[in-house]
From Swiss-Prot:
Family: Belongs to the gamma-glutamyl phosphate reductase family.
Functional pathway: Amino-acid biosynthesis; L-proline biosynthesis; L-glutamate 5-semialdehyde from L-glutamate: step 2/2
Function: Catalyzes the NADPH-dependent reduction of L-glutamate 5-phosphate into L-glutamate 5-semialdehyde and phosphate. The product spontaneously undergoes cyclization to form 1-pyrroline-5-carboxylate.
GO-annotated biological processes: L-proline biosynthetic process
Name of this protein: Gamma-glutamyl phosphate reductase
GO cellular component: cytoplasm
Subcellular location per the Swiss-Prot or TrEMBL entry: Cytoplasm
Gene: proA
Leading EC class: oxidoreductase
GO molecular function (one): glutamate-5-semialdehyde dehydrogenase activity
UniProt-listed NCBIfam families: PRK00197.1, proA
Length: 421
């Protein structure tokens, strides 16, 4: 059986590689036509997509899946409208392919340009969110990349119905239907084949899902990976912070949506203002339903908190829980963050410019914010349109991965007969 899957996946890889070549030179007009046609097709197939989703939901109920899982899996009229609108929004983004990033002239008369190009074939491995099928397919198409989509078996029917609409969009623009493929088998061995690179067909892998999925991909992949393992995000309240602003930001950073990777998991408060700032901020969080886990110093000032353990400082809760510590100013905050951070997103609330400069310069995370909530760690909020994920690595893409990050570059060098001699 595994051998059969290897053969099936090798064929998927060959088709993707073949489709990537014409897609890489497709015009902006062609790609946008395909995207808008795909959005139309999704709306036209609304009944079919909802019926497919009902099958997935019935299986989820039979398997006793958690309510949060079922919510991620569920499609309804509004969510289908949002999927179509998201695809249209990607169509309106500037086409990154062919953009001249930099150009210069050499003393010998050579003119050099650095130009954006597609990456080639992208493999996207995700779990129960059927909307990722549309988001990932559309983003890769806009950047001129072929894509192989492997969603979780729990969302197989929903993803297949959405994929069918994406293919209609490609066909409407005379682009190869194999430019967006969905893995035709649910066996997990298919993931292993993708991680091997399908014989050189896949140029990069993007995992979208929980920690165990991302850890497996990062451990086993033989091709580059754009991903983050977890979002242990910090919010630091400096002694120069405006208290009202700090209260608003802390409440939003933790409680707006607790289950996203940009939610704050640790709150650090400057020891110099702990007596005035700590109780109001923690009171707001507690009133909002958040469990407070604090260091011994925090418990002394806010007895309603539970004791924090060493494990808490390196835990991504994805829930209404926050760990809280006091630190010795910006130096203490930097030390704590650099020790425990997953290098995803950190924020500071402060009015002192030198303090903010140190925060930006001395913390090595993908996204750093000043006087703003960590929940802005999102490609849409950055003006990138949708994102395929957030990367915390240092090679190629870092932070939100949008259409621009789904490209590479090449050099075009123009001469007039120069030889090196």
């Amino acid at each position: 059986m595994t051998k059969d899957i290897a053969q099936v996946m090798a064929e998927v890889g060959r088709k993707a590689k073949a489709a990537a070549a014409p897609l890489s030179i497709a015009t902006s007009e062609q790609k946008n036509k395909a995207l808008n046609a795909a959005a139309d097709a999704i709306l036209e197939a609304r009944a079919d997509i909802l019926e497919a989703n009902r099958l997935d939901l019935a299986n989820a109920e039979k398997n006793g899946m958690a309510a949060s899982f079922v919510d991620r899996l569920t499609l309804n009229e509004a969510r289908i409208d949002a999927i179509a609108e998201g695809i249209r929004a990607i169509a309106t983004l500037p086409d990154p392919v062919g953009e001249v990033i930099a150009e210069w002239d050499r003393p010998n008369g050579l003119h050099i340009e650095r130009v954006r190009t597609p990456l080639g074939v992208i493999g996207v491995i995700y779990e129960s969110r059927p909307n990722v099928t549309a988001d990932a397919g559309a983003l890769c198409l806009k950047a001129g990349n072929a894509v192989i989509l492997r969603g979780g078996s729990d969302s197989a029917h929903s993803s297949a119905a959405i994929h069918k609409a994406l293919v209609k969009g490609l066909e409407a623009a005379n682009l190869p239907a194999d430019a967006i493929q969905i893995v035709p088998v649910t066996d997990r061995a298919a993931v292993g084949e993708m991680l091997k690179g399908l014989g050189g067909a896949i140029d990069v892998i993007v995992p979208r899902g929980g920690k165990s999925l991302v850890a497996r991909v990062q451990s086993e992949a033989r091709v580059p990976v754009f991903a983050h393992l977890e979002g242990i995000c910090h919010l630091y309240i400096d002694k120069s912070a405006d208290l009202d602003m700090a209260r608003r930001i802390a409440l939003d950073a933790k409680m707006r949506r607790t289950g996203i990777c940009g939610a704050a998991e640790t709150l650090l408060v400057d020891r110099a203002v702990a007596s005035t700032h700590l109780a109001p901020i923690l009171g707001d969080l507690a009133a909002g339903g958040c469990e407070i886990r604090g260091s011994a110093e925090v418990l002394a000032l806010y007895p309603a908190a539970k004791p924090a353990t060493e494990e808490d400082w390196s835990t991504e809760y994805l829930d209404a829980i926050i760990s809280v510590a006091l630190v010795d100013g910006i130096s203490g905050a930097i030390d704590h963050i650099n020790r425990y951070s997953s290098h995803h997103t950190e924020a500071i609330v402060a009015e002192d410019a030198q303090t903010v400069a140190r925060f930006f310069n001395e913390i090595d995370s993908a996204i750093l914010l000043h006087n703003a909530s960590t929940q802005f760690a999102d490609g849409g909020e950055f003006g990138m349109g949708a994102e395929i994920g957030i990367a915390t690595g240092k090679m190629h893409a870092r932070g939100p991965v949008g259409v621009e990050q789904l490209t590479s570059f090449k050099y075009r060098v123009r001469g007039s007969g120069q030889v090196r001699g």
